[in-house]
From Swiss-Prot:
Similarity comment: Belongs to the LpxC family.
One GO CC term, this protein: membrane
Name used for this protein in its record: UDP-3-O-acyl-N-acetylglucosamine deacetylase
Catalysis performed (reactions): a UDP-3-O-[(3R)-3-hydroxyacyl]-N-acetyl-alpha-D-glucosamine + H2O = a UDP-3-O-[(3R)-3-hydroxyacyl]-alpha-D-glucosamine + acetate
Pathway recorded for this protein: Glycolipid biosynthesis; lipid IV(A) biosynthesis; lipid IV(A) from (3R)-3-hydroxytetradecanoyl-[acyl-carrier-protein] and UDP-N-acetyl-alpha-D-glucosamine: step 2/6
Enzyme Commission code: 3.5.1.108
Gene3D superfamilies: lpxc deacetylase, domain 1, lpxc deacetylase, domain 2
Gene Ontology BP term (one): lipid A biosynthetic process
Binding site residues for Zn(2+): 79, 237, 241
Keyword annotations from UniProtKB, A to Z: Hydrolase, Lipid A biosynthesis, Lipid biosynthesis, Lipid metabolism, Metal-binding, Zinc
């Protein structure tokens, strides 16, 4: 089985910002963690409210991914998780002063910068890299997700917004490595359609949303601070979300993920199918 040394941060780092949905200022702290800890969130450390970043702890997928365990809740975790997973950080303790991770500029860039500020170091234990050996599928209405055996971690994503010509149909296929994530995926911001804003606000969401942390699409126009960072920034951000959600499998793995119009709910559904397949394969090896 493939493997590499486990990795953690060299030092503690902090970041303060606003949550995109609830609009509350929050302090985020990332700390080094011991081998085999995994990625663990805490809301109130003194009361023991620890939330491992695992699929079993997903409690919500409405416009973001929310985790809950031992009475603690933390939401909008996917951008931070995508950065940690892609930068190979296996063990880290994350404390957030509020229920929602700060949004930064709507991408993973602020979290990649935090990881660089902290530095990363190898640990003594190894982490196995799992390899999918048979395909798994998930489909719901027009959403299709599949994972196929591969020698690399690759995502091929199709985004189709027939009702918005500024987005239209976008396709991107890319091997995800730390280098490609940093250059091609991490800077890509979350986005919304202009005609969705009232609906989202009525649901108590995007209370902290602004043009500093999201891109708006209205009909055939783009409303953004500056130009799009890539012509296909929306589909790249969808890939970012998918990476963050699949990191909740809890171990690095190799597969070719094919996605058509997926969101957080379907990402998590595929993640559970991949995890089940990997666990089954592990049992066969014993």
């Amino acid at each position: 089985m493939l493997g590499r040394a486990q990795r953690t941060l060299k030092r503690k780092v902090c970041y303060s910002g606003v949550g995109v949905h609830f609009g509350k200022p929050a302090m985020l702290t990332l700390e080094p963690a011991e081998e085999n800890t995994g990625v663990v969130f805490s809301r109130h450390a003194a009361s023991g409210q620890y939330i491992p970043a695992r699929l079993a702890n997903v409690c919500g997928t409405g416009r973001s991914t929310t985790l809950s365990s031992q009475g603690g809740v933390v939401s909008t975790v996917e951008h931070l998780l995508a950065a940690l997973y892609s930068c190979g950080v296996d063990n880290v303790r994350i404390h957030c002063s509020e229920d929602e991770i700060p949004i930064g500029d709507g991408s993973s860039q602020v979290f990649v910068d935090l990881i660089d500020q902290a530095g990363v170091e190898e640990q003594g234990q190894t982490v196995p890299i799992a390899r999918l050996t048979h395909p798994v599928y998930y489909q719901h209405q027009d959403t299709i997700l599949a994972a196929f055996p591969s020698e690399e971690f690759k995502i091929s994503y199709t985004l189709h917004y027939s009702h918005n010509s500024a987005i239209g149909t976008q396709y991107r296929s890319q091997v995800i490595s730390e280098e490609s994530f940093r250059k091609e995926i991490a800077p890509c911001r979350t986005f919304a359609l202009y005609n969705e804003l009232c609906f989202l606000m009525e649901r108590g969401l995007i209370g902290g949303g602004c043009l500093g942390n999201a891109v708006l699409f209205k009909d055939d126009s783009v409303i953004s601070l500056g130009k799009l960072r890539f012509p296909d920034e929306p589909v790249r951000h969808k890939m970012l979300d998918l990476i963050g959600d699949l990191s909740l499998i809890g171990k690095p793995f190799l597969a070719h993920i094919i996605a058509v119009g997926s969101g957080h709910s379907s990402n998590i559904a595929l993640g559970n199918k991949i995890l089940e397949a990997l666990q089954y394969e592990q049992e066969l090896v014993k």
